[in-house]
């Protein structure tokens, strides 16, 4: 990344475009973060510079500027533009045909499809900070996200402010959807998180795990073998499976996914009072129909307020939907870190890593 007058320390640029779409870069000596401002302020790159590894998954669909599809999918446009990376999901997750308060919310809501305003808050060798803002179209919500780097820290710090601008109570499913892929992801990877229970969604015919719960973390019945198996151990693409699972009753809000062989990993930490659940989307080559047709190998580890990914009405029914009061403001923070270690016992919201 070119930044005039500074070639080391923290750097930031809002001067770049890709295929006509605005992008921002944040960079320090440890990591480089790319942000697609014209689509959801997605994080499309998270590269750990000492290893030249971008943890985020690239899907078979390339990053494209908006285009006219042959016809509209009932679920909406999320998959048309899903190139991988890390999206913010709001005001709902998954897809359901029924509207909420008169509006169809579509697959994973609209926050990841809208263009965001962006401005620099701080730009010094010691710290850079970018503020993004959006007001949703079909929902009475506004979202402000501030992303920051500090000198010599392999950590992206995120502060968020979500506002219900309406005079009515408004229910949401809110979460972050970072997908992890090759060249980092492989069968030497394992996920660590302080959960007590696991629930498995009835998601796809090629699911590996027995749907239901609550299973004692991390052992879950493998429905092919009939035996209990550690669900946090990443499996090879030859497994030909796809599942969505929920890690519940978290003691703290954090996870780490570590390649124990290469001693490299990626983790997140967040406020558990807001994001109470950790979802894991496991695609081990088994999503053999639309939109992946057996081509994909990835996992996503997703802090969420609620579950399952089946539209807001289902989260209301199971009592996990986040009910925002009229004019309510929610402020919270998260961090995403890269590290070199064989095993992790904790990720802190200050970007710290405790290793074993």
Identify what each model region corresponds to.
Residues 1-157, 168-171, 175-356:
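Surface-exposed acidic/polar loop and edge beta-strand patches at domain peripheries
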């Amino acid at each position: 990344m070119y930044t005039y007058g500074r070639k080391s320390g923290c750097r930031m640029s809002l001067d770049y475009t890709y295929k006509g779409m605005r992008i921002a870069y944040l960079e320090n000596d440890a990591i480089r973060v790319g942000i697609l401002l014209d689509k959801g302020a997605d994080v499309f790159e998270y590269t750990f510079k000492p290893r030249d590894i971008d943890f985020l998954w690239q899907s078979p669909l390339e990053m494209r500027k908006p285009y006219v599809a042959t016809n509209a999918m009932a679920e909406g446009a999320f998959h048309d533009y899903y190139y991988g990376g890390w999206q913010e999901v709001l005001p709902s997750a998954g897809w359901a045909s029924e509207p909420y308060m008169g509006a169809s919310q579509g697959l994973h809501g609209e926050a990841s499809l809208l263009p965001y305003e962006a401005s620099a808050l701080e730009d010094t060798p010691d710290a850079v900070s970018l503020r993004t803002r959006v007001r949703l179209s079909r929902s009475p919500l506004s979202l402000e996200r501030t992303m920051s780097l500090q000198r010599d820290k392999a950590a992206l710090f995120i502060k968020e402010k979500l506002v219900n601008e309406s005079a009515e109570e408004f229910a949401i499913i809110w979460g972050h959807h970072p997908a992890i892929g090759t060249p980092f992801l492989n069968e030497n990877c394992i996920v660590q998180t302080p959960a007590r229970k696991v629930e498995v969604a009835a998601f796809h015919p090629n699911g590996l795990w027995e749907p239901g719960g609550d299973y004692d973390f991390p052992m879950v019945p493998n429905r092919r073998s009939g035996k209990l198996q550690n669900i946090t151990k990443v499996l090879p693409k030859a497994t030909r499976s796809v599942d969505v699972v929920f890690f519940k009753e978290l003691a703290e809000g954090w996870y780490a996914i570590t390649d124990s062989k290469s001693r490299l990993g990626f983790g997140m930490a967040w406020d558990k009072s807001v994001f109470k659940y950790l979802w894991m989307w496991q695609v081990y080559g088994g999503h053999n129909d639309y939109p992946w047709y057996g081509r994909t190998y990835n996992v996503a580890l997703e802090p969420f307020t609620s579950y399952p990914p089946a539209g807001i009405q289902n989260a209301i029914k199971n009592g996990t939907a986040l009910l925002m009061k009229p004019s309510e403001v929610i402020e919270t923070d998260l961090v995403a870190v890269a590290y070199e270690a064989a095993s992790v016992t904790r990720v802190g919201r200050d970007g710290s890593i405790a290793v074993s």
